[in-house]
Amino acid sequence: KPTADFDYIVVGAGNAGNVVAYRTVQAL
């Protein structure tokens, strides 16, 4: 379970980063 939870957090953080990058590109 701890590993699965950790992976989920990492994936969530990655998705958040992609959203920020996408918005940054759109702003440009």
Curated annotation (Swiss-Prot):
Coiled coil: none annotated. Moderately thermostable. Has a 1.5 hour half-life at 55 degrees Celsius. Gene3D superfamilies: FAD/NAD(P)-binding domain (3.50.50.60). InterPro entries: FAD/NAD-bd_sf. Its cofactor is FAD. Keywords: FAD, Flavoprotein, Lignin degradation, Oxidoreductase. One of its GO terms (molecular function) is oxidoreductase activity. Its EC number is 1.1.3.-. It comes from the Eukaryota. GO terms for biological process: lignin catabolic process. Primary aromatic alcohols with methoxy substituents in position four are good substrates for VAO. Plays a central role in the biodegradation of lignin. Oxidizes veratryl alcohol to veratraldehyde reducing O(2) to H(2)O(2). This is Veratryl alcohol oxidase. It comes from Pleurotus ostreatus.
